[in-house]
Every structure is written in structure tokens, then in C-alpha cells.
Amino acid sequence: MEKRTNKMGIDNQKTSFEHQSLEVSMLDKDNFSDEELDSYLSKGEIKATDKVTIPPKILFVGDCTIATFGNFSASTGKAKSKKTFNISAMVAAAVTNTTVLNYRACLPEGKRKILYFDTEQSKYHCHTVLERIYKLSGLSFKKDDPRLMFWGLREYTPKLRIALIDYALRKYDEVGLVIIDGLRDLMYDINNGKEATDVMTVLMAWTSVYDLHIHTVLHLNKNDNNPRGHIQYSVNSYVID
């Protein structure tokens, strides 16, 4: 794909919704034309004559399915509770389509690429996570494996992080699994109900439009076992224990 320059506004962290998907651009709109409404309605229509297949099951813990295409899941835990280590094992299993620790993966051909977005760690710590995944996968450190792409989005605003994830999903083909480590960092205010709903909406849109699975990480408060902010009420049913 030809590289687009100055479209994402990296320097000043402004985004141009002209170049975003409908799924993301709709979040900042209050009014829709009849043409737009007709397009959305047509995309959402369910017909008896539709040929609908069962979504592939791609991740397991033992005999329990924890991930299918068209859905998303979440992990929670306090700081230093090995959340990222568990995610590393999950990704390592997905990269190799084998069993790593407690996780077993079975991604279909043509959907083997994994995109990993970390929203809060430094480049050094992101690289440490990537090294751990390679080690668990048995991959060589001498070359980058094309099945796994990793980005650190710590320095960007929540709106730009969403735009970058959306751009990556449009840019790269054959994606089957997306990791977002730091879901709260896609929001400006974790206690804002509208923002929480918007983030959930875009997650559901991405999984549906691109037919993949998204696994997110939510962080617990230090003094209790509750995920931080209003977003907790939206994702509780998606949490993997």
C-alpha cells in the first residue's frame, strides 16, 4: 500500500475523519444523511436467505473456547498480576497455532496475522513483551516474523490511538487476532458513559467488519477487584477469568 503522508496528523495528533472507516467516523457525528442511513441499514439487514456460517473458534483454554471471530474478550488484573505474561502466552500460541502454557490456538489459513497494540508501556518494555512472545513461540530473534506486528501507542492521544488501530485494520490483510493492551487509554475520561459506549461500539464494529477477534486488557483498581471507571460495566460479560 502506498504510504500516506500527513493524513494521520502525527505531529499535532489531529485526525482527519475523511480517511477513517465509517465505523470510527460515525462516533463524532450527530446527524446522518439519508444515503448514510440507507447504507448502515443495508449493512445491518438480516435475511432468511442469508448463508451464515458458524464463527471459527480460535483460542481455547483446555476444552473451553475463549475466542471466536466476530467477538471480543477482555482480561483484568491489578498491576504486576501477570496480565501481560498471560497475553504473551496467548499470542505465542496464536502465532504458532499450537499450545503454549494453558492456551491452544487454531487460526484458519488466511487469518493468521496478529496485531498487538500497547497503549501505556515504554518502547523498552514493549520490546521486552515482544521478546517474551518470541521466546514462548520458539521464534528466531534474528528476523521479524511477519505473522506478528507490534506497536507502542503510549505517546498519542486516545482519539489518535483509535484512528491508528482503525488504519492498521484497513491496511493489513489476513488479520485474525488483535490485542489492545490498555483499553482505558482509548478514552479521555474513564467515568464518561458516552465514551465507554463509543469504545464498545467501535470494538464490536471492528470485529464484525473485519471478521476477527479482539482481546483487550483492563486494569483493576489497586485497592479492590473492580476494573477502573465506567468502562467496567460495559465489558464485564466479556472478561476471561
Short names for language-model regions:
Residues 74-76, 80, 84-85, 194-241:
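Phosphate-binding/switch region of NTP-binding enzymes
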Residues 51-53, 155-157, 191-193, 223-227:
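Short, flexible loop segments at the rims of nucleotide/cofactor-binding pockets, characterized by
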Residues 71, 173-174, 179, 211, ...:
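Short loop/turn motifs at secondary-structure junctions
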Residues 1-37:
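Short, small/acidic-rich helices and loops at N termini and domain boundaries
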Residues 108-194, 198:
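Conserved inter-motif catalytic segment of the P-loop NTP-binding fold
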Residues 24-133, 140:
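The Walker A/P-loop phosphate-binding site
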